[in-house]
């Protein structure tokens, strides 16, 4: 079967905002992207809120974005499913959750609740932590401990205080539960196998051993701020009142990990469960009575039981292309590799027939403002070679820079990230045009176009709800009007570019209307 080669380039975190103030895209020198606005058909599409299966007002994120893109339909997210379950009180009759708390109660053991404490809604939500505490306490569990990972990435960099205050108020209102430890997500939620970071969180959670100790979570936070540590980077701090010993994780205890997004929860889960773990030397591995996760983190990790089972997504773009016997490529650097593979394939680890993957290692730096080009040039080299090989019918590529550097809150570095992308993307457009291929350049959500939080007068490090631009390079065509399309329309658009009919499971619509020859 012969098709026109199609390429989707996802500029992660590249949103659209007309105001140029604190807008890294507007402030960057981007001769190529500037040219795209005048030379190629373009539009704006939606990448947040209900358009991607999230609640109103909720910013999009990379996991949600790639899931919707690959599915070709709006995928209602775990975040919203869990919110609805709590609102309807079905959460408190969930049989897996009942099993978890009953195991702890039967053995007079503790429930340890692990999770990112914020209202960011990207990896977790504080309401889910509060509901889990309520469930455990009302079931009669006497020892309910919260190990709170502080955000500052999907929320303002210095914003943890009200979340800790609200958690303490919730515990008081419920009549049980206490904060056992705090640390920044930089340590507890690493996803790049930087094991010394995870080790710090592991030792804190299992042995109550941190770099610091404090009589209360709020005092521990203030001490971290005095050390010039923003929320994301708060060092491991054990919380124990005067005369008390820090909380430790004992044999027979139960763990409930309440992050609903899997990618940054897997490594810590692996460290706590895997008897053959080799990331670092564990002082000990508690023999837990049960380990429960709010959603499925890893099908291969059968020792962890999901509270909310995954919803199967059939006939994703990758699966459908494979059914037609076509060749496809997924390429990204480490930070976004799971997104163009696992999430793009509907949350499936399976590699489809004819699907190749290229992983380019991300640079080993503490934060990406230190190296804003990341591995974009290496990704471009590999992508350009793949295009010119004429081997692939469909290619999905992600450039991580605008999102990962944008999360640092450093405007100067973010401008450099945008300029790097501008240089790289020009090479890719040239390569695709040279083989007669067609391509879409767009984003999965916004970030780098808003680098200042004016309300809190501090750097803006989280995603935005802004629309994202879309450029089409190919045969003469017109695009859907700005604001009428969304991420779920990208897979149908790619199939139309390839000359394939979309499957009935895809309810999105092609954004590209080709002009008659």
UniProtKB/Swiss-Prot annotation:
It catalyses: (2R)-2-phosphoglycerate = (2R)-3-phosphoglycerate. One of its GO terms (molecular function) is manganese ion binding. GO terms for cellular component: cytosol. The keyword Kinase does not apply. InterPro entries: Alkaline_phosphatase_core_sf, BPG-indep_PGM_N, Metalloenzyme, PGAM_B_sf, Pgm_bpd_ind. The active site is at residue 62. Binds 2 manganese ions per subunit. Its cofactor is Mn(2+). Mn(2+) 1 binds at residues 403, 407, 463. Substrate binds at residues 123, 153-154, 185, 191, 261-264, 336. One of its GO terms (biological process) is glycolytic process. The keyword Manganese applies. Pathway: Carbohydrate degradation; glycolysis; pyruvate from D-glyceraldehyde 3-phosphate: step 3/5. Catalyzes the interconversion of 2-phosphoglycerate and 3-phosphoglycerate. Monomer. NCBIfam families: pgm_bpd_ind (TIGR01307). This is 2,3-bisphosphoglycerate-independent phosphoglycerate mutase. The lineage of its organism: Bacteria, Pseudomonadati, Pseudomonadota, Betaproteobacteria, Nitrosomonadales.
């Amino acid at each position: 079967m012969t098709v026109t080669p199609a390429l989707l380039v996802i500029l992660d975190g590249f949103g659209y905002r007309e105001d140029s103030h604190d807008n890294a895209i507007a402030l960057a020198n981007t001769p190529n992207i500037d040219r795209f606005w005048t030379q190629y058909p373009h539009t704006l599409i939606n990448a947040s809120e209900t358009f991607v299966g999230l609640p109103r007002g909720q910013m999009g994120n990379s996991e949600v974005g790639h899931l919707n893109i690959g599915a070709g339909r709006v995928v209602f997210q775990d975040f919203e499913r869990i919110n609805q379950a709590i609102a309807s009180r079905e959460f408190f009759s969930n049989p897996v959750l009942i099993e978890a708390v009953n195991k702890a109660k039967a053995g007079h053991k503790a429930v340890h609740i692990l999770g990112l404490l914020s209202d960011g809604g990207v990896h977790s939500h504080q309401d889910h932590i509060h509901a889990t505490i309520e469930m455990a306490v009302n079931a009669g569990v006497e020892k309910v401990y919260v190990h709170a990972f502080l955000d500052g990435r999907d929320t303002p960099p210095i914003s943890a205080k009200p979340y800790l205050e609200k958690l303490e108020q919730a515990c008081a209102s419920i009549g049980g539960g206490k904060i056992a430890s705090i640390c920044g997500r930089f340590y507890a939620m690493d996803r790049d196998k930087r094991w010394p970071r995870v080790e710090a969180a592991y030792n804190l959670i299992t042995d109550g051993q941190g770099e610091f100790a404090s009589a209360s979570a709020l005092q521990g936070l203030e001490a971290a701020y005095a050390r010039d540590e923003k929320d994301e980077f708060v060092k491991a701090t054990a919380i124990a009142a005067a005369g008390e010993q820090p909380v430790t994780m004992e044999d027979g205890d139960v763990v409930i990990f309440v992050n609903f997004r899997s990618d940054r929860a897997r490594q810590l889960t692996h460290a706590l469960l895997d008897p053959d773990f080799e990331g670092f030397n564990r002082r000990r591995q508690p023999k837990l009575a049960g380990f429960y996760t709010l959603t499925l983190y890893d099908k291969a990790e059968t020792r962890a039981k999901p509270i909310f089972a995954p919803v199967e997504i059939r006939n994703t773009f990758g699966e459908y292309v494979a059914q037609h016997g076509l060749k496809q490529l997924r390429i990204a650097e480490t930070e976004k590799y799971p997104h163009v593979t696992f999430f793009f394939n509907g949350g499936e680890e399976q590699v489809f027939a004819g699907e190749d993957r290229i992983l380019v290692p991300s640079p080993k730096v503490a934060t990406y403002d230190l190296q804003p080009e990341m591995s974009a040039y290496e990704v471009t080299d590999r992508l350009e070679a793949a295009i010119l090989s004429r081997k692939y019918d469909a290619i999905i590529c992600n450039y991580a820079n605008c999102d990962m550097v944008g999360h640092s809150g450093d405007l100067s570095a973010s401008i450099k990230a945008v300029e790097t992308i501008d240089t790289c993307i020009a090479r890719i457009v040239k390569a695709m045009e040279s083989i007669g291929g067609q391509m879409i350049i767009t984003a999965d959500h916004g970030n780098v176009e808003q680098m200042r939080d004016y309300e809190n007068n501090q750097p803006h490090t989280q995603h935005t709800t802004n629309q994202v631009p879309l450029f089409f390079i190919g045969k003469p065509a017109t695009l859907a009007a700005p604001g009428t399309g969304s991420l779920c329309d990208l897979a149908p658009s790619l199939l139309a570019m390839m000359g394939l009919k979309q499957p009935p499971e895809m309810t999105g619509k092609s954004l590209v209307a080709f002009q008659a020859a």
